[in-house]
């Protein structure tokens, strides 16, 4: 394939490129962390959602480029189980950043506080 044809193919297949890049990065992280890695580019591509399942916002697939909080992110539901089919999901970079930075209990407490403010409560 010529350079121009390769460039055109990449522009037309951003989801495939993202899945390949995500798998390659996940394989490296799995080896570094000593966790299982059993996924393929085809599998990751098959589970790519159009929207973040947490925020219900459209995901932006730009091949191997990060497009900010709307970029897709490969998440391990249980980090100790590694990258296996029943343990990965694609969510937004925003959702994954929040998920990995805070414990669910902390997120819940902040959500309750915000709900109280929205309902007319005191801060």
Features from the language model and the residues they span:
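Repeat-unit-sized solenoid/scaffold elements
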Residues: 74, 91, 120-122
